[in-house]
Amino acid sequence: SDVVVISRTGQIGEIYNIQGLKIALPKAPKKIIKGDNLWKPEEYPKELKRIQSIFEWKDYLDSFKERWEPYIDEQFERREKGHWFINNNIETYITGTHYMYLQWSKIDVGLPDFRESNRLFYIFWEACKADPRCYGICYLKNRRSGFSFMASGETINQATASSDARFGILSKSGADAKKMFTDKVVPISINYPFFFKPIQDGMDRPKQELAYRVPASRLTRRSIQSTDPYKIALEGLDTTIDYKNTGDNSYDGEKLKLLVHDESGKWERPNNILNNWGVTKTCLRLGSRIIGKCMMGSTSNALDKGGSNFKKLYQSSDINKRNKNGQTKSGLYSLFIPMEWNYEGFIDKYGMPVFDTPKISIEGPYGDPIEVGVLEHWHNEAEGLKGDQDGLNEHYRQFPRTTEHAFRDETQNSLYNLVKIYEQIDYNEDLKHTGVLTQGSFSWENG
């Protein structure tokens, strides 16, 4: 039984099977506070909110620090071991990374909502980090799944806790990587609470590189003679986050602790994601030891616009096909979460997807009623596009329920009726499981 343990408590609880990967969660604690019976971020105490840096904290009275140290310790504990809460009367575990995302990562709409699909994503990602055979995740995503923000949050979460490490970002173009860096990564860092924020060099909102290290200051006679213990003990992490232009050799020869690969299914010629992964994979290892991980996620472009190479990479990351060293062909582990798990408007106030049409309406996260299940809604949309082969094909591509849907090609690229071809492929796939077909070596009777 090939189980990856993500528990940091020394005890194992439930074992999840996510797309073929068995993952052992920690055991639930004896007492979990019920609270609101759903996820709500905790209010950041206003006495701490006004503290901007660790230096300001040091200047406070010991009595103030003693009062707030248990709160700060608890935050570090949750970051390291994950967090349990009660959600709709169910004991629910989220990883430390997921907790940091929900509680401390400011995104475009404020703090993110809790979603069950993201919980499963983070549990899978935690297993990728814990498994010494794995180089990271190859995530085939749906539109608006929040991956870019989640990856940005993980970059800051890891970088603020790592010394002497490098973090890199790639996207479908250099401009896209820069936008992710300036619009997502940097704001999350700025809004972190002081106790998670290391000393930063350079501008508050850097455009090129975010460096957690001590700014170089000129040594003067006065600074050398200073007896201020904080100045003497001043040590930065010497950790940097940056991005590179898209190219087959981006990050060649560098050592990375985390490589975020956003929009990897959209690398258009002459850039080739397969070639780049061949290069960047070596940034994550020393000899045969894996020292860094890749967080890769994308929807798939049309096959001749980068989709075909991404499909090959995804298929060579299948957990069920390992070599004798226990690794997949690419070294990554593939994950696909179908659209019905994460479709806006069909997620209830507990963050759970509403698959089937409910008998009485269910309350959404903002108090809005959900009266139709996501599957019925999806089928209704497909039904309405029956006469429009391009529209129907695009519906499957944009809102995929299977990897086959996600990797469909755009119809305008084909001389043939792709919808009919895909229908036949789906039909043939179904036949395999019906017992109508029998596979084997046949010999003629009386022949």
Write out the residue ranges for each language-model feature:
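Phosphate/NTP-binding elements of NTP-utilizing enzymes
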Residues: 1-447
